Structure formats: C-alpha cells, structure tokens
Amino acid sequence: MRYMLYDSDQSMVSLDRELEYLRNYVDLQRMRFEGDVTIDFEVHGTVRGCRIEPMLLIPFVENAVKHGVSFVQEPYIHVVFSIDHGQLNFQVKNKKGKMKDDVKDESSGIGLKNVLRRLDLLYPNQHVLTICDTEEVFEVDLQMTLQQN
C-alpha cells in the first residue's frame, strides 16, 4: 500500500520496488484463493540498476487474476520477468474460462487500453507488446528497454 501511495507519484522507480509490489500482490492473491489457483512468479536476471515507470506492470497481473480465475477449471497464472542488459521481457499468461457476455462488466478492457497508452507515451519505440487471446489462454508479452541508473 505504501508503494502505491508514495512511490507511484514519482516519474521512475527502481525495478526492485516494482517487482516487490507485484510479488506482494501475487502473494495476497495466493492467500485469497487458498491454493485453488496456481500462480507462478519468476524473476530471471539482474534487476539492480534498472528503473521503470511505477505501476506500469500491475494491470497485466490484475487482468490475469480478474479473468483467469472465475469460470475456469484448474486456473493458473504464470508471471515471468527476464532482465538482460536493461532489456525486460515480461510475460503474463492465464487460463481462461467461458464467460457469458452478460457477466462482463462495462470496464472490461480499460486497464489494458490505459497501459497501451502509457507505454506509447513513456516508452516510444522502446517497447513491443504482443497480446495473444485464444479461447483457452490469454497471454501478454511485453519487451521493453529499461532506464539504467
């Protein structure tokens, strides 16, 4: 909560802080679902010295929790960070269920649209976002160049 209140108003934060916030969010979701949802969280590479816009990655993970748990048999969410020489490869993958159209809320898709706008404004020509949405799986793959200290 402290990160969201105090650090998120800065223009850049350390990648360590952003990952700590995401890890805490994932741990909270694990407790919430008490083992009913498999949530993997992996970090590969060195995050020290890298900086990122705060709260940039959380909407992808929140989206996976929102859409990857309800109406899903044996739900899973995979979150993987790979950092190599200031290059971030961030992947979020979740199993999808069959949601009826009348169950979808009006805000569906707004979080991803906002992140796309932020990426275009803050990281022009420094990112590639690939979204794969099939009947069974939703996957986001973000590759971007991070600022170095």
Spans of model-derived segments:
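Two-component histidine phosphotransfer core
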Residues: M1-Q143
